[in-house]
């Protein structure tokens, strides 16, 4: 009996000792390492904790995004440290500060002097390979401005309406002709990819577009990989291989466009042609590796946002019949006012889609394709009285901003009417980022979405096969069945 109690006491002592070591010592290693070196300034850091050695809080972050409540990660910070809107943390392999207070978000976005792009290691390794990354800040800014000029503003994007309409009308007609349900999101991605490839590449065969789309899926899964390990079996390794394959596919396209230019062949210019022409402040042009990397990035962002937001908007509309009816009536009114001689949409008509714009804004707020905008402090910075050390990442946490009840009451409810007479506080609506580095394709994406929904509401309905299908949030929010549905035309 005494032996039994001795073993019991020993086991209990080992358990208590292990617990004390794990949570009293091991759990604080990250905190001691990253914050201890700051001396007295560590007391001016935002509230929070640095998680476990090496992995930080990445496991709890991933757990939240694999659940039905991805915003639970930021809600947990609210509960533990109050609604201060700024927290220290350690995710994506780096010490960081998570920002959700609108005023702080605005400061980070507008301060180009103290904050640069600060993508996770996985994104940097997959995205930047050529000389562009070594150019000066002003050189990068100039190249980015020139390269993205065809994508910004109604005057620039109006030239794409006819092309978008053609692909939208043909796609919807084809889907409606099928007797069996389709993975609507998958088909939407194919359609928007055709649109973006046509705009960016000038023109390209279906085989090229299909090959790029095929390898893009593996590439996208590795962009924000929590553990960028380049070994077989890891998503980052598959993404690296996919990136190389994308380069092999796009290089011949680049060579072809260059040959057409040297032979003075006429052809509609795409972004690829513009990227071949731009120069930095020293007159240096982008090398092929830079051009291919930029094309992959633009192709990636350009079709993902349009396809997913249009799909989620239609899902929300079909789950809210009154909202659907109101959105449809607006589109019908636009058609009724149209001259009999006019064929197709005009930019003026798209500007009249005020209610649809609210539907799209609400879908953007709820979906959050990118959970964060990534920056890095280039100097010691003060944000709302808190110290941000040089070299730390700063994550403007979009989902935390958009699901904060202080910014949007009842944030889980789809409610386009919340945008009626709504004055958006700077930094409180940031689906495309903000500041000088705001997503250059935002206007083009909203144009695509508007045209898709316009033609869909007028001519089709969506019969969801699994109306209560749960959502998945990695790598981006989507229905787990890819929105399995029938597209039914009105007779």
Swiss-Prot record:
Listed InterPro entries: Cyt_P450, Cyt_P450_CS, Cyt_P450_E_grp-I, Cyt_P450_sf
Subcellular location, record wording: Membrane
Keyword entries, A-Z: Heme, Iron, Membrane, Metal-binding, Monooxygenase, Oxidoreductase, Transmembrane, Transmembrane helix
Bilayer topology term: Single-pass membrane protein
Uppermost EC category: oxidoreductase
Binding-site positions, heme: 439
Pfam families associated with the record: p450
Cofactor(s) demanded: heme
Gene Ontology cellular-component annotations: endoplasmic reticulum; membrane
Main subcellular localisation: membrane
The EC number(s) this enzyme carries: 1.14.14.-
Tissue expression summary: Expressed in maturing fruits and in juice vesicles.
Gene Ontology molecular function: ent-kaurenoic acid monooxygenase activity; heme binding; iron ion binding
Keyword Transmembrane helix: yes
Domain of life: Eukaryota
TM region positions: 5-25
PANTHER family per record: CYTOCHROME P450 26, CYTOCHROME P450 88D6
Family stated for the protein in its record: Belongs to the cytochrome P450 family.
Name this polypeptide is given: (1S)-1-hydroxy-luvungin A synthase CYP88A37
Species of provenance: Citrus sinensis (Sweet orange)
